[in-house]
């Protein structure tokens, strides 16, 4: 018996979609372009809203997120050592200003006593 090929000339082996790439190619494409997944969960009981959860998920590379204007990880002290340093530097500057003001006030009172 002979096996016959019943496909039309030029027909690909996967007619219902593009040829599948590797998982790495798919991940690279998603991180390069970014993907947004949005959803809402709402729980009502007798027309009384008990719970509403709004989910927004943005999956992208750091560069793509920065292009989209998202950079919260740079300012969150729990995630960025630079943010923690910035917070400490601001606190240090405030404390120095307070110390200078207190020393100035103490100098004025000791000068008035003399």
Swiss-Prot record:
Point to the regions of Basic and acidic residues compositional bias. 1-10
Output the Pfam families linked to this UniProt entry: Gas_vesicle (PF00741)
Database matches in InterPro entries = Gas-vesicle_GvpA-like, GvpA, GvpA-like_CS
Naming one, the record's GO cellular component terms include: gas vesicle
Q: Does the keyword Transmembrane helix apply?
A: no
Q: What does this protein do?
A: A minor component of the gas vesicle, might be involved in nucleating gas vesicle formation. Gas vesicles (GV) are hollow, gas filled proteinaceous nanostructures. It is not clear what function GVs perform in soil bacteria.
Subunit comment: Interacts with GvpA.
**Protein's UniProt name:** Probable gas vesicle protein J2
Which classification does the entry list for the species?
A: Bacteria, Bacillati, Actinomycetota, Actinomycetes, Kitasatosporales
